């Protein structure tokens, strides 16, 4: 069964899907954790507007890495994937900044 909202339209046909993505300032940071392991942290995606779990799942597939959603608003991916994540999110319509 397809997801529907109050209009009864399937989610894929909703003209406002992705509305406001360019207004969200998404920040990508890489942090060094225990044993020298890197973690890519993505924050700034509004969970009220976007399905953050779905985005995290797609990102994990794209970069072939494990990851999680913290506090319902921060995506953490295992490894340094700054450039791949930046391109993926920009293709989705987000405004992305990468911190070195």
UniProtKB/Swiss-Prot annotation:
Presence of keyword Endoplasmic reticulum: no
UniProt xrefs under Pfam families: SUI1
GO biological process: formation of translation preinitiation complex; regulation of translation; translation reinitiation
InterPro entries documented for this protein: DENR/SUI1_TIF (IPR050318), SUI1 (IPR001950), SUI1_arc (IPR022851), SUI1_arc_bac (IPR005872), SUI1_dom_sf (IPR036877)
Keyword terms of this UniProt record: Protein biosynthesis, Translation regulation
Recorded GO MF terms: mRNA binding; translation initiation factor activity
SUPFAM superfamilies membership: eIF1-like
Annotated family: Belongs to the SUI1 family.
Name of the molecule in the record: Protein translation factor SUI1 homolog
